[in-house]
Amino acid sequence: MVHVLERALLEQQSSACGLPGSSTETRPSHPCPEDPDVSRLRLLLVVLCVLFGLLCLLLI
């Protein structure tokens, strides 16, 4: 189990784009911009995972 001794260190590491654990004063007021390439890559990974899962089920 890992314990973070310095709360400021934890907030500094998790404050990007309003991640959970960041305090409200360090969160940016605007959401992170959505990159279309990242969205396509995420969709491709989901489709590949589903196809791999179906292949595994068929091989059982």
From Swiss-Prot:
One of its GO terms (cellular component) is endoplasmic reticulum membrane. It is a single-pass membrane protein. One of its GO terms (biological process) is symbiont-mediated suppression of host antigen processing and presentation. Residues 14-26 have a biased composition (Polar residues). The chain crosses the membrane at residues 41-59. Keywords: Host endoplasmic reticulum, Host membrane, Host-virus interaction, Inhibition of host adaptive immune response by virus, Inhibition of host TAP by virus, Membrane, Transmembrane, Transmembrane helix, Viral immunoevasion. It is found in: Host endoplasmic reticulum membrane. GO terms for molecular function: protein sequestering activity. Residues 14-34 are annotated as: Disordered. Interacts with host TAP1 and TAP2. Belongs to the lymphocryptovirus BNLF2a family. Participates in viral evasion from HLA class I-restricted T-cell immunity. Associates with host TAP1 and TAP2 and prevents TAP-mediated peptide transport and subsequent loading. This is Protein BNLF2a.
